C-alpha cells in the first residue's frame, strides 16, 4: 500500500521527527539509517523532513542531547550535590538507571555511537565528562572512608556504568522489573561489594 495523500497524513513537528529517528537508529544503527528510512517511518516524503532539521546528524545530535542533558542535569540535583559522598554516589547510580529506563531509546543511541562524526565525538566527550564527575564522587567516598581504597576509582566507575549501561540491552518496558527494582539491585550489588569493611 502506498503513502496516504498529504492531506490525510498526521502532522508532525521536530520532536516527532526526532522520536521516529531514534526508533529507526536503534533498529538499524545510525550508520545503517538513511533519511529515506526515517521519512518512510514517518510516512512522509524525504524532502518534508528538511523543513524541521538540517539532516541525519542533526537528528542524532537532538537525540543524544536528550539523554546527555538528563544525565548532566541530574548531577546538579540536591541528592547528587549534598551530603556524604557515598550517599551522593548511590543517588547518582539510582538516578542514572531511572534516566536510562525513562529515556531508553535515546540512551541506547548514545551508548552505541562510535565517534565517526563530529556529533558522535562531541557526545562521547560529554559522556566522558559525566563519567569523570562520577569518578570524582567515587574518589571522595573513598577519601571519606566509606568505600574500599584498594580498587582504582576509574575502574570502579567503569564497572558501575558497565552494569548500569547493560540495562539498555535487556530491559523491556512494561516488564516485570521497574526502574526502581533495577536501580535497587544495582545499588545492592555495587555498594555491598565496594563498602569498606571495619
Task: Report residues per predicted region.
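Basic, helix-initiating cap at the start of DNA-binding domains
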Residues: 1-28, 32-44, 57-61
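Amphipathic, non-transmembrane alpha-helical scaffold segments
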Residues: 10, 18, 60, 64, ...
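Base-recognition residues in the alpha-helical recognition helix of bacterial helix-turn-helix
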Residues: 26, 50-52, 62, 66
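Short coil/turn segments at alpha/beta junctions that flank glycine-rich nucleotide-binding fingerprints
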Residues: 27-31, 82, 103, 144
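Key DNA-contact positions within bacterial/archaeal DNA-binding proteins
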Residues: 47
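Short secondary-structure transition hinges
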Residues: 58, 91, 97-136, 143
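Hydrophobic alpha-helical connector segments
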Residues: 62, 76-102, 157-160
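Hydrophobic/aromatic-rich alpha-helical bundle segments in the mid-to-C-terminal region
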Residues: 107-112, 120-124, 128, 142-189, ...
Amino acid at each position: 500500500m502506498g503513502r496516504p495523500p498529504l492531506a490525510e497524513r498526521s502532522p508532525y513537528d521536530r520532536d516527532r521527527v526526532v522520536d521516529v529517528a531514534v526508533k529507526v537508529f536503534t533498529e538499524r544503527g545510525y550508520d545503517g539509517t538513511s533519511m529515506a528510512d526515517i521519512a518512510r517511518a514517518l510516512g512522509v516524503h524525504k524532502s518534508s523532513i528538511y523543513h524541521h532539521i538540517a539532516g541525519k546528524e542533526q537528528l542524532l545530535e537532538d537525540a543524544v542531547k536528550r539523554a546527555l542533558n538528563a544525565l548532566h542535569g541530574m548531577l546538579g540535583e540536591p541528592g547528587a550535590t549534598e551530603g556524604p559522598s557515598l550517599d551522593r554516589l548511590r543517588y547518582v547510580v539510582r538516578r542514572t538507571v531511572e534516566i536510562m529506563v525513562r529515556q531508553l531509546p535515546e540512551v541506547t543511541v548514545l551508548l552505541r555511537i562510535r565517534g565517526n562524526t563530529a556529533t558522535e565525538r562531541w557526545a562521547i566527550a560529554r559522556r566522558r565528562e559525566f563519567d569523570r564527575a562520577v569518578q570524582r564522587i567515587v574518589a571522595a567516598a573513598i577519601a571519606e572512608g566509606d568505600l574500599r581504597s584498594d580498587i582504582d576509582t576509574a575502574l570502579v566507575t567503569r564497572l558501575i556504568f558497565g552494569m548500569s549501561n547493560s540495562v539498555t540491552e535487556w530491559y523491556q518496558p512494561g516488564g516485570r522489573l521497574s526502574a526502581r527494582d533495577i536501580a535497587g539491585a544495582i545499588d545492592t550489588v555495587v555498594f555491598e561489594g565496594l563498602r569498606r569493611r571495619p
